[in-house]
Amino acid sequence: MSIYDDIFKQFPMIDEWSDSDEKILVEPYTYLGINTAKELPSMVTKAFNHWYQVPQPALDIILQIIGPIHAASLLLDDIQDDSDLRGGNPVAHKVYGVAQTINTATYVCFDAYHKVSQLTPFLKSPETTDLWSIINDEIAALHRGQGIELYWRDSLMCPTEEEYLRMIHNKTGAIFRLPIKLLQALSSVDSPPDCFPLLNIVGILFQIQNDISSLSPDFTKDKGFCEDFSEGKFSFPIIHSVKADSSNSLLMDILRLRPKDEATKRKALRFMKDQTKSLDHTFHVLCKLKKTAQEELEKLGGNSELSSILERIQVSPTPEIEDR
C-alpha cells in the first residue's frame, strides 16, 4: 500500500520533528563550539545585572537568548568576510557549506526569539512592556551596522572615524544593548541607574580592541595573519592610516588587492606603524576611552565584575606589534 493511498494519515508524521533532525539542523552552530557563558556579551550581561538585580531564572533565559544570536552573527560574519579560520579551526561554512550555515544561523535566531515569551511571567507590567520590540530594534541595528560596513568594503569607500564609531554603535553595540535592555525591562529595582552611556563605551572599546588585536601575531592562530587586509575591511587603525596620509595610496591599493600573502600584508602593517603611526593612535584612543569608561563606572558606584572585564582592554602596544 502506498503512503499516498491515504495521504491524510501522513500529516501527523510529517509534522514530527525528532532530536536527530534537530542535531543535523544545528550542526554548524554546534561546530562553532562557543561556550556562551564565557563569551563577552554574556559576561557583560551578568556584570550589568549588578544594577538591575534580575532574578537568576530570568537572567538565565536572557543569556539563552543572547548566546545564540551572538553565535549566529559570528556564523554570518565569517561568510560575509570570506574568513578561513575562527578560533584556529576552519570556519563553519568551509565545513558545512554556505547554504546550510546561513540556514542554521537564521534558525538559531528564531529559536532564541521564541524564548522571549518565557520572560513574560517576570514582568511587573506585561501589558505595557514589549520585549519583542527590544529584540527587533537591536537585531535591526545589528544588520544596519553590518550592512554599512559591507558597503564600505565592497565600494572601497573609507569612512571617517566618526562614521566608523556610528557603525560600531549599531553593529557591535546591539549585541551588548539587547540583553541589557531586557535586564532593564525585568529589573527588580524601582529606579535603576542609567547604564547605557557606559555600555555604549564598552561596545566601542571592545570593537577597537578587536581591530588592533587582529593586527597582532598572537591573533594569527585564531583568524590568520592580518586578515583585515585580505578581507578589504576598514577597521579603526586602517581608517586612521588612510585618512592620515591621503596623498599616499599604498594602503588603499593593498586593500583593493585583498592580499593573501604575508609579505604584502607586512608591508601594509609597517606603513601603518611607521608612516602614519596608526597603531599608536589606536592605543591612544583605547586609553582615553578606557579612562572614560572607568570614570563612568565610578559615577555608578563601582562594579568589581565589570572592572575586571575592562581590565582586559590593552591600552599599550605589545612587543610583538612593536617588532613589526
Swiss-Prot record:
<dbReference type="GO" id="GO:0008299">
    <property type="term" value="P:isoprenoid biosynthetic process"/>
</dbReference>
<feature type="binding site">
    <location>
        <position position="77"/>
    </location>
    <ligand>
        <name>Mg(2+) 2</name>
    </ligand>
</feature>
<feature type="binding site">
    <location>
        <position position="81"/>
    </location>
    <ligand>
        <name>Mg(2+) 1</name>
    </ligand>
</feature>
<protein>
    <recommendedName>
        <fullName>IDS-like terpene synthase 3</fullName>
        <ecNumber>4.2.3.-</ecNumber>
    </recommendedName>
</protein>
<dbReference type="Pfam" id="PF00348">
    <property type="entry name" value="polyprenyl_synt"/>
</dbReference>
<feature type="binding site">
    <location>
        <position position="81"/>
    </location>
    <ligand>
        <name>Mg(2+) 2</name>
    </ligand>
</feature>
<keyword id="KW-0479">Metal-binding</keyword>
<dbReference type="GO" id="GO:0046872">
    <property type="term" value="F:metal ion binding"/>
</dbReference>
<dbReference type="InterPro" id="IPR000092">
    <property type="entry name" value="Polyprenyl_synt"/>
</dbReference>
<comment type="function">
    <text>Terpene synthase that shows monoterpene synthase activity and produces linalool, using geranyl diphosphate (GPP) as substrate. Also shows sesquiterpene synthase activity as it is able to convert farnesyl diphosphate (FPP) into (E)-nerolidol.</text>
</comment>
<keyword id="KW-0456">Lyase</keyword>
<comment type="similarity">
    <text>Belongs to the FPP/GGPP synthase family.</text>
</comment>
<dbReference type="InterPro" id="IPR008949">
    <property type="entry name" value="Isoprenoid_synthase_dom_sf"/>
</dbReference>
<keyword id="KW-0460">Magnesium</keyword>
<dbReference type="GO" id="GO:0016829">
    <property type="term" value="F:lyase activity"/>
</dbReference>
<dbReference type="GO" id="GO:0004659">
    <property type="term" value="F:prenyltransferase activity"/>
</dbReference>
<feature type="binding site">
    <location>
        <position position="77"/>
    </location>
    <ligand>
        <name>Mg(2+) 1</name>
    </ligand>
</feature>
